[in-house]
Curated annotation (Swiss-Prot):
Monomer. Keywords: Glycosidase, Hydrolase, Periplasm, Signal. GO terms for molecular function: alpha,alpha-trehalase activity. Its EC number is 3.2.1.28. It is an enzyme of class 3 (hydrolase). The active site is at D319, E503. It comes from Salmonella dublin (strain CT_02021853). It catalyses: alpha,alpha-trehalose + H2O = alpha-D-glucose + beta-D-glucose. One of its GO terms (cellular component) is periplasmic space. This is Periplasmic trehalase. Substrate binds at R159, W166, D167, N203, R212, S213, Q214, R284, P285, E286, G317, E518. One of its GO terms (biological process) is cellular hyperosmotic response.
Length: 570
């Protein structure tokens, strides 16, 4: 039986068959014009809308261990025809749903297990993985949920067969470190293409990810490319930077104090900040059954509200974390859309500063001043509303209760990362992180053990890099060294035992991959590879780079992070 809260997706099939058929024709033409983002195409529909009750029934039948499998399956013919056949056959005696799926869909192939050559150092292993993780989808099948991209790209690994937005920046750090500037340029071009095609960078290049974005790292990507190409990169991608900013700020002009619209929030004092948001409020196709179960566990809340908050947490990249929940042990208390995240607003500060720099490079001083003013206003709002003076760290703002939240998370390091923190406050954040988050194997995401993957005891490579670089920005080199050395030791010990790098690590010790979440631990792994290479160069002298973590801990970090040219330490 289809849950009432998603019945509209099913009824849509009956009510607008002609319109949907038109959408399918548009989708067919879309794949043929993938390299031309200027072509006027409608947004392709995700599989839960294309397949309606069939999608719901397959996912609820749990035919596959991973719900993402059927979301990524490719219809072998027109989905409307498959759906019509399903309606006719499903009530017949002896109907076999799995057989029907096997006949009518091409399931994603399991990736061949990569066996690295014996005796490789950590650096050699990572360098050998780049071609293994590289994909090209310039052309895709007509009804594939995969969205084509004009250039090749590097995927995270494991079950993740597509490109992901914020993952990619940390992967690109490693590509640059390995000298693959051509791949860095290709990936920036792909994200620029997505902005032109969809008005934003989606969570990933799948139709079911189009309704949301992820932490906005495109400005950092362009700044990274500018290290190699100079200001030409800034000037080339200025239009896309402006479009991404417009996406995050959509509706701000009409907001009154105390109002919110999609991704933008205006507080009672007129301060403008942002939140995570997904345009849809139904179960995620890639986690269909899990989301329905979460909703059923809390019948006192509107289902659509929970669905949107689950989706918005996926947009945050932290899916899931006690950070978004009223009760850390109950996922259905999630309320991402009523929380103003400190890391998101730090990243948008960086976007504003990059827009100012790019505008200046293009000779538009007026625009540069405009974006600088927006960045300064955001910085003041961060200091005013996202600083917990009682606790002594940056935190998220609670729109529901109109107050700063008390929880310390690794997101507190983001204002340091973008050079937006006051120096005295940066010192307090460093002390808090060292006292409450630093563990033997690196920096814990939070201090809460909820069973969710973005909580203790897990540590994630991107947050280690944000912390290490942010701490160095403010002269907190000792704490930066602790984070760097402990995490690298964890990565090295795991690699020595298992000959792989993984998505996340248990930082309560060293040598163990992380747990929790909706799927098994994944290896590969794009952002861990990138951060590991960058950190190896932090602990080893530039004149004598190391290929593995040294047996003896260095006295200090050997290199300083690349300062963001558009931001200055306060």
């Amino acid at each position: 039986m289809i849950p009432p809260e998603i019945r509209r997706s099913v009824l849509l099939q009956k009510a607008i068959k002609l319109a949907l058929a038109g959408t399918l024709l548009t989708f067919a033409s879309f794949s043929a014009t993938a390299a031309d983002p200027s072509s006027d195409t409608e947004t392709p529909q995700p599989p839960d809308i294309l397949l309606g009750p069939l999608f719901n029934d397959v996912q609820n039948a749990k035919l596959f261990p991973d719900q993402k499998t059927f979301a990524d399956a490719i219809p072998n013919s027109d989905p409307l025809m498959i759906l019509a056949d399903y309606r006719m056959q499903r009530n017949q005696s002896g109907f076999d749903l799995r057989h029907f799926v096997d006949v009518n869909f091409t399931l994603p192939k399991a990736g061949e297990k990569y066996v690295p050559p014996a005796g490789q150092s950590l650096r050699e292993h990572i360098d050998g993985l780049w071609p293994v993780l590289t994909r090209s989808t310039k052309n895709v099948e007509k009804w594939d949920s995969l969205l084509p991209l004009p250039e090749s790209y590097v995927v995270p690994g494991g079950r993740f067969r597509e490109i992901y937005y914020w993952d990619s920046y940390f992967t690109m750090l490693g590509l640059a470190e390995s000298g693959h500037w051509d791949k860095v340029a290709d990936m920036v071009a792909n994200f620029g293409y997505e902005i032109d095609a969809w008005g934003h960078i989606p969570n990933g290049n799948r139709t079911y990810y189009l309704s949301r974005s992820q932490p906005p790292f495109f400005a950092f990507m362009v700044e990274l490319l500018a290290q190699h190409e100079g200001d030409d990169a800034l000037k080339e991608y200025l239009p896309q930077l402006q479009k991404e900013y417009a996406y995050w700020m959509e509706g701000v002009e009409t907001l009154q104090p105390g109002q919110q619209n999609q991704r933008v929030v205006k507080l009672e004092d007129g301060s403008v900040l942002n939140r995570y948001w997904d345009d849809r409020d139904t179960p995620r196709p890639e986690s269909w059954v899990e989301d329905i179960a979460t909703v059923k566990s809390n019948p006192n809340r509107p289902a659509t509200e929970i669905y949107r908050d689950l989706r918005s947490a996926a947009a945050s990249g932290w899916d899931f974390s006690s950070r978004w929940m009223d009760n850390p042990q109950q996922l259905s208390t999630i309320r991402t859309t009523t929380i103003v995240p400190v890391d998101l607003n730090a990243l948008l500060y960086q976007l504003e500063k990059t827009l100012a720099r790019a505008s200046a490079a293009a000779g538009d001083r007026a625009k540069a001043s405009h974006y600088d003013a927006l960045a300064n206003a955001r910085q003041k709002a961060i200091e005013m509303h996202l600083w917990n003076n009682k606790e002594g760290w940056y935190a998220d703002y609670d729109l529901k209760n109109n107050k700063i939240r008390d929880q310390l998370t690794a997101a507190a390091l983001f204002p340091l990362y973008v050079n937006a923190a006051a120096k005295d406050r940066a010192a307090k954040v460093a002390a808090a992180a060292q006292a409450h988050l630093l563990q033997p194997g690196g920096l814990a995401t939070t201090s809460v053990k909820s069973g969710q993957q973005w909580d203790a005891p897990n540590g994630w490579a991107p947050l280690q890099w944000v912390a290490a670089e942010g701490l160095q920005n403010y002269g907190q080199d000792d704490v930066a060294m602790e984070v760097t050395w402990r995490f690298l030791t964890n990565v090295q010990h795991t690699y020595d035992r298992e000959k792989k790098l993984v998505e996340k690590y248990d930082v309560s010790s060293t040598g163990t991959g992380g747990g929790g979440g909706e799927y098994p631990l994944q290896d590969g792994f794009g952002w861990t590879n990138g951060v590991t290479l960058k950190m190896l160069d932090l602990i080893c002298p530039q004149e004598k780079p190391c290929d593995s973590v040294p047996s003896t801990r260095p006295a200090s970090l050997s290199a300083t992070p690349t300062k963001t040219p558009s931001a200055a330490t306060q």
